[in-house]
Curated annotation (Swiss-Prot):
Domain Helicase C-terminal: 490-709
Binding site for Zn(2+) 1: 520, 523, 560, 563
Name of the gene encoding the protein in the UniProt record: priA
Keywords, in A-Z order: ATP-binding, DNA replication, DNA-binding, Helicase, Hydrolase, Isomerase, Metal-binding, Nucleotide-binding, Primosome, Zinc
The organism of origin for this protein: Rhodospirillum rubrum (strain ATCC 11170 / ATH 1.1.1 / DSM 467 / LMG 4362 / NCIMB 8255 / S1)
Protein name: Replication restart protein PriA
Cross-referenced SUPFAM superfamilies: P-loop containing nucleoside triphosphate hydrolases (SSF52540)
Helicase ATP-binding domain: residues covered: 240-406
Cofactors: Zn(2+)
Matches recorded under InterPro entries: DEAD/DEAH_box_helicase_dom, Helicase_ATP-bd, Helicase_C-like, P-loop_NTPase, PriA, PriA_3primeBD, PriA_3primeBD_sf, PriA_C
Length: 811
């Protein structure tokens, strides 16, 4: 039939020419559906290959899906709807399709829900409209242009100005390739007006050109820094792995050992072989230094991929990857699902980081899925960390991963000295408030709120940095009572000494905002989120109370919403804003800034902060966990951990492991160059295994204790866990479904089901939540067990059962 669309470039036909006039194909749609739908291929339409993107009708709308195979043939052809056409987009590569199927099966999720992550930018599925370009005109046109300038037919444009000659030289170096005007001007080192004038004179020919983005290619042969013997041995190991197909490798190195430069060598070798490389970072949107280091090493920036990119940037990045024009991608976990035509290496940096686990939608761990993606593609996956997860360590011990170790800091720098400050013996001291403008002067923190929070400080005892006060009466408005401090005398002295030496200090407190809890001193009411089982966190900088789970916010009230008493609300416990308030009082001459995810909101802000720290425009940084990852600031010689015990409490399986990793990482920010560093950790429990391991400088000491405890309980990595989270707006329905799942719980050797119980976050975003936890022996295949379990219970409308295989959060 005339006018039917042709296949996009890169596709081939699925069916032979003598096949039935209207063959049937299975099309997977990016929707949470049970499987692919059958569609017929109209007579005369090109017959698509597996992986081809197609437009199909779905109800009254049109969707773009992917041909997943031949149709099942269960529906009569006359009842099938026909394909509409093909978007101008390369087909999904076979390894990506296999990966989508694997992830869906492993996570017990619909394959269409996984496909949606691969087709996350619908606008990228169509080619951009062609744009105007310029190229060298034909000989006849060139002569006409010269005559128009009064030059006559002089050969070679001898009378052209030097700038115009450079423009034509660029075009001669790329015969037949049209340039955008701005690109041509940049390559020839002329202004845009020169190109415009040449076009008007007929010296350039206007043509339409593809508007696809082609990022500058990194130079794999650009010389890198001289590697140490340890680095060279590790780099050789990675290069060897590139010759051997799939393998998993653990690149473990102490903080400052130069792991990045080692895996840069593997990226360079991958580029020499003409293949693509992917680097996953836990918070790429906030990692300002990594792209700079890459550009310094390879002479070009990597293609970035993360959620804070604008729609246009995501569109062009997605298509650049799909068209093979993105040699190196650095991204967040979702970059795993980009359509690489020839991926040859995956690096997972900071592989231990919990940010690699997606909790919403399709729950998956990008660290583990990266290894699967590499296995399906037949190339290496490198997991890099100074504090590897216990799961990764166990895989290395069992021989599943090759273990490469960098035991020393690069360049002769020494590891920092770590000292525990026992707050029971040297508690923080109170301080008298003065006028306070906060870091950055008028643009910093807001001034304290008055008598209500001062009253709390006057009454509450200070045994711990996170102690909560008891309600008390308001003092006289004329009083200037002492406030609770969060910095102990030894830490204050160390900060003063470091600042006096012209060096920088990082005070670490992994808690955003001003105070984690606000209560009424009159009636004891605690301000809670109306949509979640969580306290509202005060953010005094902008006068708001915020829920850190759902995003709800409200102004800080002047009266208690429960009893109506005015000026009775008191903040409890410290956040980074409150710590900054004390630091500004104790170190008034220090230039100070706060680094948290709500103050450093994206790549530009992160880059600006990193530049200010590197240029020593800041003396004292007060930061959360975003300061613990990958930063290299040679002048930071003191790290003070304000609350080392934060995160150790609660029933989280990995609480101790995560605390050890985080504190070890933040300690690694100290003394990364020729100046020695020291780390002071405030704690009320210096005998805790985490604290003892940190003080000893021997992470293996902690891992040995942690592994023994997990193995005794058959917990991961020595056992399997699957969480079922039942949620809905109707509490009774949620409880009924949870109870039904409890009654239908699987039984058998190596299986145990805990629950149902209300989740610790019993309400989240207005939905009631219950949990069950399937605990299984290491060798049990849990997915068939879970599928059968779910099939035994009818799930009513409005109730959702979320399956989380290998959970890391138990909220």
């Amino acid at each position: 039939m005339a006018g039917l669309p042709a296949l996009p470039p890169g596709s081939r036909e699925l069916f032979p020419e003598d096949a039935h006039a209207e063959p049937v194909v299975a099309v997977l749609l990016p929707l949470p559906l049970a499987g692919a739908y059958d569609y017929k291929v109209p007579a005369g339409m090109a017959r698509p290959a597996v992986g081809t993107l197609v437009r199909v009708p779905l109800g009254r709308r049109e969707e773009i899906g992917v041909v997943w195979g031949a149709g099942a043939g269960e529906t009569p052809p006359e009842r099938l709807k026909p394909l509409i056409g093909f978007p101008e987009c390369p087909p999904l590569p076979a390894p990506l399709r296999a990966f989508i199927d694997w992830v869906a099966a492993y996570t017990v999720q619909p394959p269409g829900a996984v496909l949606r992550m691969a087709l996350s930018v619908p606008a990228a599925l169509e080619a951009p409209p062609p744009a105007l370009g310029w190229r060298r005109p034909s000989a006849g046109q060139r002569a006409a242009g010269q005559r128009a300038e009064g030059q006559g037919p002089l050969p070679g444009g001898a009378r052209l100005s030097p700038g115009r000659q450079r423009v034509l030289a660029v075009l001669d170096d790329h015969p037949g390739l049209p340039f955008a005007g701005a690109d041509l001007a940049r390559e020839a080192a002329v202004g845009p007006a020169v190109v415009a004038a040449m076009a008007k004179a007929g010296l350039l020919e206007a043509v339409t050109r593809s508007n696809e983005w082609s990022p500058q290619a990194p130079d794999a042969d650009r010389p890198g820094p001289l590697l140490s013997a340890d680095q060279q041995a590790a780099a050789d190991g990675l290069r060897t792995a590139l010759d051997q197909g799939f393998s998993g490798l653990l690149l473990e190195g102490v903080t400052g050992s130069g792991k990045t430069e080692v895996y840069f060598e593997a990226i360079a070798e991958t580029l020499r072989r003409g293949r693509q490389a992917l680097v996953l970072l836990p918070e790429i949107a906030l990692a300002a230094q990594w792209p700079r280091r890459f550009a310094d090493r390879f002479g070009a920036a990597p293609v970035q991929w993360h959620s804070q990119m604008g729609a246009a940037a995501r569109r062009r990045a997605w298509r650049a990857v799909a068209l093979g024009r993105a040699p190196v991608v650095v991204g967040a976990r979702s970059a795993l699902f980009l359509p690489y035509p020839d991926l040859g290496l995956i690096i997972v940096d900071e592989e231990h980081d919990s940010a690699f686990k997606q909790e919403e939608g399709v729950p998956y761990n990008a660290r583990d899925m990266a290894v699967v993606r590499a296995r399906l593609g037949g190339f290496p996956a490198v997991l890099a960390s100074a504090t590897p997860s216990l799961e990764t360590i166990e895989n290395a011990r069992q021989g599943r991963y090759r273990h490469l170790v960098l035991p020393r800091r690069h360049g002769g720098a020494e590891m920092p000295e770590i000292t525990l400050l026992d707050l029971r013996r040297a508690p923080p001291q109170k301080w008298l408030p003065t006028d306070f403008a906060g870091p950055g002067g008028s643009e910093g923190l807001a001034a304290p709120g008055g008598a209500n929070d001062e009253a709390e400080e006057q009454k509450a005892p200070p045994p711990s940095p996170t102690a909560s006060p008891s309600p008390t009466a308001s003092p006289s408005p004329m009083a200037r009572p002492a406030r609770l401090g969060w910095l102990s005398p030894p830490l204050i002295t160390a900060v003063e000494e470091t600042l006096a030496a012209g060096e920088q200090v990082l005070l670490f407190l992994n808690r955003r905002g001003y105070a984690p809890l606000t209560l009424c001193r009159s009636c004891g009411h605690r301000l809670k989120c109306p949509r979640c089982t969580a306290w509202l966190v005060e953010h005094r900088r902008d006068g708001r109370l915020r829920c850190h789970h759902c995003g709800y916010q409200q102004p800080i009230p002047e009266t208690c919403p429960a009893c109506g008493v005015a000026d009775s609300l008191a903040p409890c416990g410290p956040g980074v804003e409150r710590l900054a308030e004390e630091a500004a009082h104790r170190f008034p001459k220090a230039r100070m800034d706060v680094a948290a995810s709500d103050t450093v909101t994206g790549p530009k802000e992160a880059a600006a902060l990193a530049t200010r720290i590197a240029n020593h425009d800041i003396d004292l940084i007060i930061g959360t966990q975003i300061m613990a990852k990958g930063h290299h600031f040679p002048l930071i010689t003191l790290v003070g951990v304000v609350d080392g015990d934060l995160g150790l409490t609660g029933g989280d399986l990995r609480a101790s492991e995560r605390t050890h990793q985080l504190l070890h990482q933040v300690a690694g920010r100290a003394g990364r160059a020729e100046r020695p560093g020291r780390v002071l950790i405030q704690t009320v429990d210096p005998g805790h295994p985490v604290m003892e391991a940190l003080a000893s400088g021997d992470p293996a000491l902690f891992l040995e204790v942690e592994a023994a405890e997990r193995q005794a309980l058959a917990m991961p990595p020595f056992g399997r866990l699957v969480a079922l989270v039942i949620s809905g707006e109707d509490s009774a329905r949620v409880q009924a479904v949870a109870a039904a799942l409890g009654r239908a719980a699987p039984m058998g050797p190596g299986l145990d089901v805990l629950g149902p119980v209300p989740a610790p976050l019993a309400m989240l975003r207005g939905r009631h939540r219950h949990r069950l936890l399937l605990k299984a022996a290491r060798g049990v295949k849990v997915q068939p067990v879970v599928r059968h379990w779910l099939s035994l219970v009818s799930i009513p409308p409005g109730v959702k059962v979320q399956v989380d295989v290998d959970p890391i959060s138990f909220l």
